[in-house]
Amino acid sequence: MSDPIVPLILSGGSGTRLWPVSRRTWPKPFMRMADGATLLARTLERALAVAAPGAPVLTVTGRDHYFITRDEYAAAAPAAVERHRFLLEPAARNTAPAILLGALDVADRHGGHAIVVVLPADHLIADVDGFARSVHAGAALAAEDWLVAFGVPPDRPETGYGYIRRAGALAHGGFEIERFVEKPDLATAQAYLASGEYLWNAGMFCFRAQALLDAAALACPEVLEAARACHLDTPRDARVIEFAGDSFRAIPEISIDYAVMERAHRRAVVPARFDWNDIGSWTAVSEQATPDARGNRVVGEAVLVDADGCFVQAETRAVALVGVSDLAVIETADALLVAHRDRAQDVKRAVEALRAKAHPSTEHHLTVFRPWGSYTVLEDAPDCKVKRLTVKPGQVLSLQYHHRRSEHWTVVRGTAKVRVGDVETLLERNQGTFIPMGVVHRLENPGSEDLHLIETQCGDYFGEDDIVRLEDVYGRVRG
């Protein structure tokens, strides 16, 4: 096949269904599974398995997730670092804007004949070879200008997924699509399963870039024109492209299913020849762990006494369960979830209640990743806040000051280059400095190993919005 395959990874999420591990700033693609790999890393592995030799892997993600994604890719596939290109969204707008902007980018750089394979970054697929075979079957149909969806043969009457009803058989093991259907009730799902004519809609697609754009011009011209305006409004000569905020937000917020696939004429479905799990609940996560004789599954340190059918994931503390059954217990450093396993889909209701209270556990973990490294909150009191900062070699924090707090820095490991006012000094282990309120300062790691530093803040407000950046190598100074 002469048409090059360009994978388009969609990485994002709101962090509701798998709270407290998944959060707004740390969505599902960054979660680690039982084998220690993140869903994002596994998606990248699949993308590289089907991409044309030397072709880029295009990733659409949020601006706030770029540096984490970049580092995850570098760790997962260091030899492929130069092949990555990123399209950064200033806000989430559902899948149609992301996919149309990706198709416009691919058409510009590789021609409208290039085949785009859309891969959500939060699916678990173990059989990479089977996945690649299915993608190549879909690509063969896409080369004939079909818009291809990948459907998963159902093994149960699932009410949490949309379905695709297949019609007549096509070449390459595909079928024409008769219609897309919404998430059904249980009785309808049972009928779908019994008929053998329905597939789960996996949210994975394959098409020539120009074929999608042509279909969008007919099905949703207003969405395409807004996407095209954003595309033209954005500088595109770099490996990292950040969409202009106003023109991006002008694109209607709609899924690619509603905008294009349900209205298009030449559409096909390829049944998946691989295992598939969208990891959409803690029940799905638990199935990745090995059960004991009583059906309990444990990740982390836990003791279960007279317990049956429970799942425990403990990240920072030992967990003990006594005389209970069918519970999911998820422990993190700052939040604990206890839910009946039959109510796993309702976790998002708890998250909504916490967000209504502006609870920080819905936004971020105690350890927060930044372009330069990370920080972990050790103490958060009304009059002080203590953090442990880890700065990667060669990285530098922004030149900044604060209105409402002073800071004390103490080096625990490594060497720190510190600027306070107009004075620069080098600090070694067990040395420190004081930064008065309102004084410009900067921290840098000039060494070849991680710098570890304890930061003690004193004042009456410690929010991240009390950082006034004057210079920043990561582009975080905005007018």
PLM feature segments, named:
Residues 2-5, 53-55, 81-83, 111-114, ...:
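Short coil/turn connectors at secondary-structure junctions
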Residues 363, 446-479:
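Double-stranded beta-helix
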Residues 116, 197, 204-205, 277, ...:
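A residue-level structural signature of the nucleotidyltransferase/glycosyltransferase Rossmann-like core
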Residues 126-248, 268:
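Conserved core of the sugar-phosphate nucleotidyltransferase
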Residues 30, 86-87, 147-149, 267-269, ...:
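Conserved beta-strand scaffold positions in the cores of enzyme catalytic domains, especially
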Residues 2-4, 210-410, 415-433, 441, ...:
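Left-handed beta-helix
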Residues 1-9, 16-120, 124-130, 136, ...:
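Conserved N-terminal catalytic core of the sugar/cofactor nucleotidyltransferase
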